[in-house]
């Protein structure tokens, strides 16, 4: 089959695991419907690791369902040893300057397979500028909750009061959201945050989405989970197509494909180890790819797990390349009680019957995976949207218990409290309630991605519109 006859979609991702994975899942789904997808991110550090972990060859078409996907990696322009790559304030404008030209060059290189749509995630908002300049429809994948999107929207338009330097402790009242205390709003919006640059880039994406009238705004959620908030946002932004298409990882599970976005090879024996455990006997612990806890806090969590009597599967990442963080050391007796790995297939782990609960940083990817697996969460957020996600898990979805309030709290949670919260999530009436609620959300998520479900129909509508645009352009002789 001639790939040049396929509708061609180019996806551009910020180089980070939590950004790459959802966008790649979307890309695989698009390809599976008979389209051609080119997935683009930077060569270092993530592209290089993706290539190694997945045996990816640049530009080579890989079949996915009825279509194809390929990968392109471009240089970010930094020398190998340039530490500015790991300084977001320096990296952001540099990536924009280099990336705009690289994406233009890629689009022109594939002129015999004209790009019908450009899709990006929120940390590379400048892709919308490229799309507008080249007169290509664009779409954005939002990889946080619709609740967080609403918070950013209200902050950007100054529709309600948010914490300020003079009033840092005020709560925030947003329609369709629970009352958020000052440390429960997305932390990048708080004036005390050391990471306000992350909030700025997200706000840049919001501005571009409104100004450029992007083709679609995808959200990795499902309608049944955030119905009222989505209806409210659709009323606020009638010109936008706000389209929930999640859980993306669940949608992508229906595909037979070896294309993955992992930066590391998962531990090969962790699933076999789980097979040897009793049902609901293991706490799974992972704090994502970015968050770094203090050694003292890691030790308190370790001793809390030991006191709880649960077995543990714990993902402890080595320090990221270019960062100056000491590797964590865990008590030897914990290793005898459980299994410590650098990486694991989280979706499969959470679905395993041995998992009793998930001690999580509450990033949105992990939140969606826990809800879809029907697993209770012990919430230990650090920053960004994680603190808001923790509110929803504990108070709205009612599948979680709160262990901490975020890095801004600047306190070490004791081993006694860790053990108490682990037991609360796994033993007794509260644990039964959490598990029942989690199973209910699991069923709702499965219904959303099933044939004819809300997310499935939203996705099919998008693909149909893209294909129609492509056919119309061909009929008009456009290239």
From Swiss-Prot:
Its EC number is 2.4.1.120, 2.4.1.177. An anthocyanidin binds at residues 19, 384. SUPFAM superfamilies: UDP-Glycosyltransferase/glycogen phosphorylase. The active site is at 19 (proton acceptor). One of its GO terms (molecular function) is hydroxycinnamate 4-beta-glucosyltransferase activity. Belongs to the UDP-glycosyltransferase family. UDP-glucosyltransferase that forms glucose esters with phenylpropanoids. Glucosylates 4-coumarate, ferulate, caffeate, sinapate and cinnamate. This is UDP-glycosyltransferase 84A3. It comes from Arabidopsis thaliana (Mouse-ear cress).
């Amino acid at each position: 089959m001639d790939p040049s006859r396929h509708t061609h979609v180019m996806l551009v991702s910020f180089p980070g695991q939590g950004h790459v994975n959802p966008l790649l899942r979307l890309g695989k789904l698009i390809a599976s419907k008979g389209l051609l997808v080119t997935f683009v991110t930077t060569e270092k550090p993530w592209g290089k690791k993706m290539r190694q972990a997945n045996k990816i060859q640049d530009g080579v078409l890989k079949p996915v369902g009825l279509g194809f996907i390929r990968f392109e990696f471009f240089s970010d322009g930094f020398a190998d040893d340039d530490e500015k790559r790991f300084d977001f304030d320096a990296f952001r404008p540099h990536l924009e300057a280099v990336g705009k030209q690289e994406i233009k060059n890629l689009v022109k290189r594939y002129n015999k397979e004209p790009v019908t749509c450009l899709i990006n995630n929120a940390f590379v908002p400048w892709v919308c500028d490229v799309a507008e300049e080249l007169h290509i429809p664009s779409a954005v994948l939002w990889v946080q909750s619709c609740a967080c999107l609403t918070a950013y929207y209200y902050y950007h338009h100054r529709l309600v009061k948010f914490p300020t330097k003079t009033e840092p402790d005020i709560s925030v009242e947003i329609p369709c959201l629970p009352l958020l205390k000052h440390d429960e709003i997305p932390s990048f919006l708080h004036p005390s945050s050391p990471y306000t640059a992350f909030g700025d880039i997200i706000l840049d994406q919001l501005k571009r989405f409104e100004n450029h009238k992007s083709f679609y705004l995808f959200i990795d959620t499902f309608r049944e989970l955030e119905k009222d908030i989505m209806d409210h946002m659709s009323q606020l932004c009638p010109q936008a197509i706000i389209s929930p298409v999640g859980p993306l990882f669940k949608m992508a599970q229906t595909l037979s494909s070896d294309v993955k976005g992992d930066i590391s090879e998962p531990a090969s024996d962790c699933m076999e180890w789980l097979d040897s455990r009793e049902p609901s006997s293991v706490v799974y612990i992972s704090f994502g790819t970015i968050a770094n806890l203090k050694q003292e806090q890691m030790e308190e969590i370790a001793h809390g797990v030991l006191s709880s009597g649960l077995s543990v599967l714990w993902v402890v990442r080595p320090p990221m390349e270019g960062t100056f963080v000491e590797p964590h050391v865990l008590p030897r007796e914990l290793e005898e009680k459980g299994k410590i790995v650098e990486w694991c297939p989280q979706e499969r782990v959470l679905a395993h019957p041995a998992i009793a609960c998930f001690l999580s940083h509450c990033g949105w990817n992990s939140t969606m995976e826990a809800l879809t697996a029907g697993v209770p969460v012990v919430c230990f957020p650090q920053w960004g949207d994680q603190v808001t996600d923790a509110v929803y898990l504990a108070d709205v979805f009612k599948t979680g218990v709160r262990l901490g309030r975020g890095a801004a709290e600047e306190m070490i949670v004791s081993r006694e409290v860790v053990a108490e919260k682990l037991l609360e999530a796994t033993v007794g009436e509260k644990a039964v309630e959490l598990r029942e609620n989690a199973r209910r959300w699991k069923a709702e998520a499965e219904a959303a991605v099933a044939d004819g479900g809300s997310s499935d129909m939203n996705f099919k509508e998008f693909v149909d519109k893209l294909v129609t645009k492509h056919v119309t352009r061909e009929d008009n002789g456009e290239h």
